[in-house]
Curated annotation (Swiss-Prot):
It comes from the Archaea. Catalyzes the ATP-dependent addition of one alpha-linked L-glutamate molecule to coenzyme gamma-F420-2, producing alpha-F420-3, the major form of coenzyme F420 found in M.jannaschii. Thus, caps the gamma-polyglutamate tail of coenzyme F420 with a terminal alpha-linked glutamate. Prefers ATP to other purine nucleotide triphosphates; GTP gives about 25% of the activity observed with ATP. Cannot catalyze the addition of the following amino acids or analogs: D-glutamate, beta-glutamate, L-aspartate, L-glutamine, L-alpha-aminoadipate, or D,L-2-amino-4-phosphono-butyrate. GO terms for cellular component: cytoplasm. Monomer. Binds 2 manganese ions per subunit. The gene is cofF. Pathway: Cofactor biosynthesis; coenzyme F420 biosynthesis. It is an enzyme of class 6 (ligase). This is Coenzyme gamma-F420-2:alpha-L-glutamate ligase. Residues 101-287 form the ATP-grasp domain.
Length: 288
């Protein structure tokens, strides 16, 4: 019997437990390894006996501070020869929003104009260089779940939001207005092992549409253009499992973010068993 281990910071997400259930239905053993457990210690001789690791962790903000602990933990497991799906290079890419934007833009995928900034002066320089108007978006490059993402509507707000930018990995980004009839509706498409599983639109009165913030979903009809876009993103990021977040406008689709550990609640809400698709892929790779 193959064994798959899911790495999770605290195990609060229902997606983690739903995925474990689907893996076990396929006859594989599945453990959830909680990085927050007081019983665990990553020492020099620590080993994790498993056939495959699926990490729900990366570099990110937890409790308003940037932590590298989960990333160092993953790197230590790599030294032991552990196999990961998604690959570690994909985990790093999707954790770093700026690197991700750079890769997409280099490969002719439309993204909002974005800059990595050190301070307020960099932010002003960016606005002037691209002749942008307010509002603009300020976000932390390693933020999660829509947290630490803000809108600056004028220079005073911009100055406040760019304090300590160089220490916090802050980005400034062109604001893409994707509002429809007073509501913001972006898109999340899931790709698993080269197949588009499905997608939904996240509906919000705020430009931050993350489900973590309490927003709702509606089913997305995926046309050929969207399917090709999602598959290209998965190919570029070398991802087996990927959530592709897209801002739709009248004329274009803008890819805003890639997620290598996408939540599956939104898919369950529209009747798609994404956990089963992910579980099938993980079991295949664990057996290979």
């Amino acid at each position: 019997m193959v064994k798959i281990t899911i790495l999770s910071p605290e195990g609060r997400s229902c997606s983690v437990w739903s995925l474990k259930n689907e893996i076990e239905k396929l006859g594989a053993k599945c453990d959830i390894f909680l990085l927050s457990s007081p019983e665990n210690l990553m020492s020099h001789d620590f080993k994790l006996e498993t056939d495959l690791i699926h990490s729900r962790c990366g570099i990110g903000d937890y409790f308003d501070r940037l932590t590298l602990y989960s990333w160092q933990f993953i790197n230590a497991l790599e030294v032991e020869g552990c196999r990961f799906i998604n690959p570690i290079k994909t985990l790093y890419l999707t954790s770093d929003k700026f690197k991700c934007i750079k890769l997409l833009a280099k490969n002719k995928i439309k993204t909002p104009k974005t800059a990595l900034i050190r301070d307020y002066e960099d932010a002003v320089k960016f606005i002037e260089k691209y002749n942008l108007r307010f509002p603009v978006v300020i976000k932390n490059s390693f933020s999660k779940c829509g947290l630490k993402v803000f809108m600056a509507r004028n220079y005073d707000e911009l100055k406040q939001l760019t304090k300590n930018a160089i220490w916090e990995g802050k980005l400034i980004q062109e604001f893409i207005d994707f509002k429809e009839n007073d509501l913001y509706r972006d898109m999340r498409i899931l790709v698993v092992d080269g197949e588009v599983v499905g997608g939904y639109r996240r509906v919000s009165r705020d430009f931050r549409t993350n489900l973590y913030l309490g927003n709702v979903v509606e089913k997305l009809n995926i046309d050929e253009e969207l399917e090709e876009l999602a598959l290209k993103c998965a190919d570029l990021s070398e991802a087996v499992i990927l959530g592709v977040d897209i801002l739709p406008t009248k004329d274009n689709y803008y890819v805003i973010e890639l997620n290598s550990s996408p939540g599956t609640k939104g898919f369950r809400d529209i009747g798609i068993n994404a956990d089963k698709k992910i579980a099938e892929a993980l079991v295949r790779y664990a057996k290979s």
